[in-house]
Amino acid sequence: MDKCIKFDTMINHFNRYQVGLTLNNLYPTINGKCACGCNNDLPKNRKKWFSDICRQKSYINFAIVKGDNKIIRDEVFKRDKGFCCKCGVYSKYWQADHIRPVFIGGGACSLYNLQTLCIDCHKEKTKTRKN
């Protein structure tokens, strides 16, 4: 489950950058359980994360929520493997596209609203939206 859904009261989905949100706000440690939400009991030698994988995934998600463009682009490219989601062509030159436009609430918080589009498909989508 997307961690952002649990924290709707803290995250303004219309803002690209979540000012004032801290890692501890998004991932509190509760009752000796891993802060990432995996529900694993923390080993005695750990205070917040069950594993390094939990920590890394949480840091990446936090960077996405905070609007870190490099992390966002890296994760979208990794997920879509460099292929345009519309025409299927592979390119290292691509654009991250908001499926639901930012101005109607498709701004921040998760990768679910982003897709890779080749430059031609992105131009076509943008042109169609303006008409």
Regions found by a protein language model. Give the residues of each.
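BZIP DNA-binding basic region
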Residues: M1-R16, T22-I60
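Short, charged surface segments at domain edges that flank catalytic/cofactor-binding sites
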Residues: F14-I30, C54-K86, G106-A108, Y112
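Short cysteine-rich loop/turn motifs with clustered Cys
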Residues: G32-D41, D68-Q95, C118-D120
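Short Cys/His-rich "knuckle" micro-motifs
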Residues: L42-K48, Y93-D97, T126-K130
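Active-site donor-binding loop signature of nucleotide-sugar glycosyltransferases
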Residues: D52, P101, I119
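Short Cys/His-centered divalent metal-binding micro-motifs
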Residues: R55, K92-Y93, L114-N131
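Histidine-centered nuclease catalytic patch
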Residues: G88-T116
